[in-house]
UniProtKB/Swiss-Prot annotation:
<feature type="transmembrane region" description="Helical">
    <location>
        <begin position="101"/>
        <end position="121"/>
    </location>
</feature>
<comment type="function">
    <text>Required for the export of heme to the periplasm for the biogenesis of c-type cytochromes.</text>
</comment>
<protein>
    <recommendedName>
        <fullName>Heme exporter protein B</fullName>
    </recommendedName>
</protein>
<feature type="transmembrane region" description="Helical">
    <location>
        <begin position="46"/>
        <end position="66"/>
    </location>
</feature>
<keyword id="KW-0813">Transport</keyword>
<feature type="transmembrane region" description="Helical">
    <location>
        <begin position="21"/>
        <end position="41"/>
    </location>
</feature>
<keyword id="KW-0201">Cytochrome c-type biogenesis</keyword>
<keyword id="KW-1133">Transmembrane helix</keyword>
<keyword id="KW-0812">Transmembrane</keyword>
<comment type="similarity">
    <text>Belongs to the CcmB/CycW/HelB family.</text>
</comment>
<keyword id="KW-1003">Cell membrane</keyword>
<dbReference type="InterPro" id="IPR026031">
    <property type="entry name" value="Cyt_c_CcmB_bac"/>
</dbReference>
<dbReference type="GO" id="GO:1903607">
    <property type="term" value="P:cytochrome c biosynthetic process"/>
</dbReference>
<feature type="transmembrane region" description="Helical">
    <location>
        <begin position="126"/>
        <end position="146"/>
    </location>
</feature>
<feature type="transmembrane region" description="Helical">
    <location>
        <begin position="157"/>
        <end position="177"/>
    </location>
</feature>
<keyword id="KW-0997">Cell inner membrane</keyword>
<dbReference type="InterPro" id="IPR003544">
    <property type="entry name" value="Cyt_c_biogenesis_CcmB"/>
</dbReference>
């Protein structure tokens, strides 16, 4: 399938440029490491704000990884070739989003035990963090891909990209923080997780069409 071939191609290209994969992950760990040093040794304060720190670090590290999503394909002309394949453009866009999540969102989930250790998170809060990252990071990848598709033709689109996508990240951040707060209070958080899951399903279903339309606009201009 062309869909799987595109994912494989994206992973192979990323492995050749491993710095672009590792930099956001290092940034994630750096933010999580520095926050406890800044706020001091108060364990109560750290336990109260630590879950939010983890999600803010994940959001910022995601921003660092977005620009390369369509940039190289746009520069070398392969993006136009992908648009001419037999596969519909929304499916091509979804394949690139899946590859982006495998390279950025999944590693953040795998790094969450280290984050929990650095932030002294309890096991139940760490598990809630894993669930929110599992449901929330695909939404970040989908929204970020729409922003990248709109700004891919601009020379300095990084600032504009941030202005476009960060406000759209806020609902994910709010519900993820609500889940983590509920986990800290040992109260049920199934409702918040269901909303995050609905966001993920909606983003994965609808964003490929928005990305495809944005790419056509960018290439036409």
């Amino acid at each position: 399938m062309i869909f799987l071939e595109i994912i494989k191609r994206e992973l192979q290209i990323a492995m050749r440029k491993n710095a672009e994969i590792l930099n956001p992950l290092w940034f994630f760990l750096l933010v999580i490491t520095l926050f406890p040093l800044v706020i001091g040794p108060d364990p109560k304060l750290l336990s109260r704000i630590a879950p939010g720190i983890a999600w803010v670090a994940a959001l910022l590290s995601a921003l660092l990884s977005f620009e390369r999503l369509f940039r190289d394909d746009f520069i070398d002309g392969s993006l136009e070739q992908l648009m001419l394949t037999a596969q519909p453009l929304p499916m091509t866009a979804l394949a690139k989003v899946v590859a982006h999540w495998l390279l950025t969102g999944l590693p953040l989930i795998l790094l969450s035990p280290i984050a929990a250790l650095l932030l002294s998170l309890e096991v139940n809060i760490w598990w809630a963090l894993v669930l929110t990252l599992l449901l929330g990071t695909p939404v970040l990848s989908c929204i970020g891909a729409i922003g990248v598709a709109l700004t891919v033709g601009l020379r300095k689109g990084g600032v504009l990209l941030s202005l476009l996508v960060v406000p759209l990240f806020i609902p994910v951040l709010i519900f993820a923080s609500s889940v983590l707060e509920a986990a800290g209070l040992n109260v049920p958080y199934g409702g918040q997780l269901a909303i995050l899951g609905a966001m993920m399903v909606g983003a994965v279903t609808l964003s490929p069409f928005a990305i495809a339309a944005a790419l056509r606009i960018s290439l036409d201009n």
